[in-house]
Regions:
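HhH-family (HhH-GPD) DNA N-glycosylase catalytic core used in base-excision repair
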Residues: 1-279
Length: 279
C-alpha cells in the first residue's frame, strides 16, 4: 500500500487509516512496551519514544525525542505499525472460511506489528510461563537498568549494553529460570552465532530451527519472534488458547484461504478464542 502521511511539528500523521484498533493491537500479547496514558498510547517503537492516537481515520504518531530525519521516522513507523500490509485484501481472502470470517468480525482492527528483532527475542524469552503484567514489569526494569534514557523514558538495551551483564544480575530483575536463557541469547547475538540478517533470509522452516539453537527458545517462542520481528507470516505460534481454537473451531485443520499468512490469521483466532471459547 502507498504511504499517505503529513508532518506536523514532531508528529507524523498517517491519513485514511481504516479499521485499526490500537487497543487490541497493543494489548493482544505481541508487544510489552506500550501503555495507555491520557487517552494516548505511549511506548517505544525501536529507537523512537512515541505517543500514538487516532482521530477518526487519521493516526497521529508523535515522537517524544527530536527527529533528525522525518522521512526515515515516517517510513519506520509505517512499517512498524503494519500499515504497509493490505489488511482489506487479507480479511476478504480469509473470510472465504466462515469461522475465520466470524473471528475477523469480532476484532477487525487487530494488526501484526513489525518489531525490532533483539527486543522481540528477549521479551518473548521472558514471556515463558509468565503473565503480561509481570512480563512488562521485568522488561521495563531491564530498560531502566541497562537501556539509554530518552527524555523521561528508557529504550530497550542493545546487545552491546548487555555484554557484561551476568546471570546473577538478570536474576536481580526477577527473571528467575529465564536469566540463563537471556544470557545465552545475548552471547549468541554478540558472537554472531545467531545473526539477524541471516535469519531473515532463511525460509520459515530453516529460520525456526536456526533460532531454536538459543537455550530456552522452543517452537512457541521461535514462532513469536519470527512472526513479530522477521516477517515470517506463515509462522503460527501456539499457546493454550490457540490449541483450544484448533480443537473446537478447526478440527479438520486450518483453512486453505490463510495459507502463507497463517500468522496474520492467528491474531484474529487468538483474540476470538480468548473471549469466546470455553476453557
Amino acid at each position: 500500500m502507498n504511504m499517505k502521511y503529513i508532518y506536523d511539528k514532531n508528529t507524523v500523521v498517517f491519513t485514511a487509516v481504516t479499521d485499526y484498533d490500537l487497543q487490541r493491537t497493543f494489548n493482544c500479547g505481541q508487544c510489552f512496551r506500550w501503555d495507555f496514558k491520557d487517552e494516548k498510547w505511549q511506548g517505544f517503537a525501536g529507537e523512537y519514544p512515541c505517543r500514538i492516537w487516532m482521530e477518526k481515520d487519521d493516526m497521529y504518531v508523535q515522537c517524544l525525542s527530536p527527529v533528525e530525519n522525518f522521512d526515515r521516522f515516517g517510513s519506520y513507523m509505517y512499517h512498524y505499525l503494519g500499515l504497509d500490509m493490505d489488511y482489506i485484501r487479507l480479511k476478504k481472502q480469509f473470510s472465504a472460511d466462515e469461522t475465520m470470517k466470524k473471528a475477523i468480525e469480532y476484532a477487525p482492527g487487530i494488526r501484526v506489528l513489525n518489531q525490532p528483532f533483539f527486543e522481540t527475542l528477549l521479551t518473548f524469552i521472558i514471556s515463558r510461563n509468565n503473565n503480561i503484567p509481570r512480563i512488562k514489569k521485568i522488561v521495563d526494569a531491564m530498560a531502566v537498568t541497562y537501556g539509554t534514557k530518552v527524555g523521561d523514558m528508557y529504550a530497550f538495551p542493545t546487545p552491546s549494553q548487555l555484554k557484561d551483564v551476568t546471570v546473577e544480575q538478570y536474576n536481580e530483575l526477577r527473571m528467575g529460570f529465564r536469566s540463563k536463557y537471556i544470557y545465552d541469547a545475548v552471547e549468541k547475538i554478540l558472537s554472531g552465532e545467531v545473526d539477524e540478517n541471516s535469519l531473515k533470509e532463511m525460509d520459515y522452516t530453516a529460520a525456526q530451527k536456526y533460532i531454536m539453537q538459543i537455550k530456552g527458545v522452543g517452537p512457541k517462542v521461535a514462532d513469536c519472534v519470527l512472526l513479530f520481528s522477521c516477517e515470517k507470516y506463515e509462522s503460527f505460534p501456539k499457546d493454550v488458547w490457540i490449541n483450544r481454537a484448533l480443537a473446537q473451531l478447526f478440527p479438520d485443520g486450518l483453512p486453505d484461504c490463510i495459507k502463507g499468512m497463517e500468522g496474520i490469521a492467528q491474531q484474529y483466532i487468538f483474540h476470538y478464542a480468548r473471549f469466546n471459547l470455553e476453557k
